[in-house]
Amino acid sequence: MATLDTPPSDTPDQNFLQSGDSVNFDLSAFSPAAAADAEEPVSFAEQDTSAEAVTASVAPDLFGTLAPEPSAEIAPVEETEEEPKFAPGETIHDVATVRGMYQNWFLDYASYVILERAVPAIEDGLKPVQRRILHAMKEMDDGRFNKVANVIGQTMQYHPHGDASIGDAMVNLGQKDLLIETQGNWGDVRTGDGAAAARYIEARLSKFALDVVFNPDTTEWQLSYDGRKREPTTLPVKFPLLLAQGVEGIAVGLSTKIMPHNFRELCKASIDVLRGREVQLFPDFSTGGLCDVTNYNSGMRGAKIRLRATIEKVDKTLLIIRDIPYGSTTTALMESIVKASEANKIKIKKVVDNTAANVEIQVQLPTGVSPDLTMDALYAFTDCEISISPNTCVIIDDKPRFVGVEDVLRQSTAATVRLLERELEIRQDELWEKWHNASLEKIFIENRIYRRI
């Protein structure tokens, strides 16, 4: 039994422990094995000799007959996956093994992320969220600017993943300055500044988007996620939009990273494709700078391009960075310069960011430091030079495919030709119907058929 050893106390209540009281538990009342554990420790040799005697008998502890016979050999149990047993009315969705759930549900999730979230379709070069934004803006279009918050709310009828993803995608489209005309503070890709809140900025479709992106007669439609609305499967884009804008996305097991290309070069290359000539495309960046495309390899997997900032030497104590590499920002570039200076890799006096309409980062040098050597050090140890690995992955026939940018251009050009042919056929049918109706009216009046009615 458990006993309490407490010193005498003058307090009237003797049932509570006082400071300094000790508690002694008689472990032998519970189990001889527990009592043996409570004894003074013995040597390892004594423990080995006594272990056999302890395991030779069944411990009469609190678990009673639950204690296994030590002498009995336990055969290894072979792990086998049992087939799911179905009760009346149950289906595989009600009863499934863990392995089956992993194989089916994870693959379904991965396929959904690839096809419906991260990777663009080759037909129009758009991700689903971008396509739904443009479709919602087309429905709202009356020639005037709309609040971005209003556009986001309209798009949520088609995109079931929340306002944050829609807002980020719309800002990204607006910063490319191709499909959307913007009004207000939409941020700056050069400095890394974010856009203002959606209730403060406005947007509308550009004239270019209205001309080359939309045509309800040649659009294939599908039901929205809740079945209440119609949305386009793909938009009838008559331009290599994917190569003009570029895109970046991360899915389950793969990613895509397509560089933007020059608008005029894409038009010229499309004409060359129609004439059967060989074409070769290289990226073009709105941030300027220098680009080494020696290992571009049509933007396929394993490709690599090097990007450099443009550095101007003003005098012996001043360098000015005029352009920054694509994907970097002036803030990140300045931080990399400061870190390199703190690590004694470059010697600078001060870094000042005077970026306004154009990028201007002043790098002031101490007296006696070579500006040429400092420029080399800036390229070697800072973000004045970075590398990017393109990876052209697009959705073709509902499957992700890795192709080159020239292949994307050829398929886009062929799709544009088919769309134009289809539009001409529709226009021809409309004109024939109009001519036919006009001819019937003429016959009706000239022959005075109305008198017979």
PLM region spans:
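Long, charged, helix-rich clamp/arm modules that form nucleic acid-engaging surfaces
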Residues: D61-R99, F106, I114, A118-V119, ...
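Long hydrophobic segments that form regular secondary structure
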Residues: K316-N354
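Short amphipathic beta-strand starts and helix->beta connectors
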Residues: P236-V237, G302-T310, S341-K349
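A common structural junction motif
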Residues: L274-E278, S341-K345, Y379-S387
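Hydrophobic side chains in well-ordered alpha-helices
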Residues: L266, L333-S336, T374
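Catalytic phosphate-handling regions of large nucleic-acid enzymes and associated NTPases
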Residues: A2-G302, Q362
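Conserved catalytic-core segments of large NTP-driven translation/proteostasis enzymes
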Residues: K238, N295, I305-A309, T317-D323
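Long amphipathic alpha-helical segments
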Residues: R204-A209, V213-P216, A332-S336, Y379-I386
